[in-house]
Amino acid sequence: MKTKLSTCNVWSLLLVLLVWDPVRLVLANIQEDEAKNNITIFTRILDRLLDGYDNRLRPGLGDSITEVFTNIYVTSFGPVSDTDMEYTIDVFFRQKWKDERLKFKGPMNILRLNNLMASKIWTPDTFFHNGKKSVAHNMTMPNKLLRIQDDGTLLYTMRLTVQAECPMHLEDFPMDAHSCPLKFGSYAYTTSEVTYIWTYNASDSVQVAPDGSRLNQYDLLGQSIGKETIKSSTGEYTVMTAHFHLKRKIGYFVIQTYLPCIMTVILSQVSFWLNRESVPARTVFGVTTVLTMTTLSISARNSLPKVAYATAMDWFIAVCYAFVFSALIEFATVNYFTKRGWAWDGKSVVNDKKKEKGSVMIQNNAYAVAVANYAPNLSKDPVLSTISKSATTPEPNKKPENKPAEAKKTFNSVSKIDRMSRIVFPVLFGTFNLVYWATYLNREPVLGVSP
């Protein structure tokens, strides 16, 4: 029984193999024929679509307005140039419209094509109003995508890198915020022929890749969209606007400018604690800090465009410069009054000595006159001669009169101006910093509003 069963299984397997090979070949031939038929069908569809198609004419010419739906996917944003007031953005720019001439029927609902077909049909003549330079990527082939649906709806996508203008108001620099626009629209068609519409809402029509930020000095806060109509001598045109909201990072400028300025001001106030007689040391402090502030103010302006107004950093540097220069003027004032005080002290000492010498001379002159008047009678009167001798003989036990101490120059003394400056200067500078940082850091960023 076992031998008969095994023999039956072998014959069954051989029979299946003999039957399956022809069936497999037949199925493969059928699939190959279907693929060839599909290619043939698609080729015929495309040929039929382009037969009599004029890509010089827009869809719905003379009947309706062509509506172009757009959205943008940002793959890379930045860098932003402050000196040139421009930014660079890399995007997938998508446009969608309907062309009744491209309706078709076939086994597929969507035809997925490349840039070769895009050059044979009508496409919107979109350009960027504020673009300084735009590049369409062509490596290794033009980065373009075209999809045609069976109802005539087309999706046209291309990869672009755009350098666009970004108007900046730098009054609050470096605590400033900006709204960089990207404006685009039709170059030739007015609003009565072609109009643009955002495909989705504000958050979905312009999307930024999670790793798309290429900003070192800014934070990308978000984006908004808008639409406006501009008038020119050739008609009215639709302009689509996407705003990218930026907030500057202050850390770099704190390290490079603010901290050095603060330390320079503090260093200039160290001279208040030096002796007023230390002229070389205090002069070095004053001149060095003034030159340092000059260098800092020049270097801070190098990274900015040459604007005609003062920025927040300019005001800070100007006030710091005023404090440093005031410290130098304070030393000059202290030095002037110190030397003037010494001069008055010396003059008073000289006057006292002159007065004392004058009184001695007056006494000697009076005595000489008395002697001269009574000299002829001294020999006649023995009493007068005795008195005159006793008058000329000094008294040995007479104590000298107490004379006022001579004024002396006082060294290592502290000026009243220095004492006041030690308190007034730090208090004023601290108050200025408190008001300055509280004003600018708590201020809400002023961003451009989309029309």
From Swiss-Prot:
Extracellular side: 29-249, 301-311, 442-451
Signal peptide (UniProt feature, chain positions): 1-28
Subcellular location: Postsynaptic cell membrane; Cell membrane; Cytoplasmic vesicle membrane; Cell projection, Dendrite
Domain of life (superkingdom): Eukaryota
Positions with biased composition (Basic and acidic residues): 396-408
Cytoplasmic side: 271-280, 333-420
Glycan-linked positions: N38, N138
GO biological process: gamma-aminobutyric acid signaling pathway; inhibitory synapse assembly
Stored Pfam families: Neur_chan_LBD, Neur_chan_memb
Family: Belongs to the ligand-gated ion channel (TC 1.A.9) family. Gamma-aminobutyric acid receptor (TC 1.A.9.5) subfamily. GABRA2 sub-subfamily.
Name under which the protein is recorded: Gamma-aminobutyric acid receptor subunit alpha-2
UniProt organism field: Mus musculus
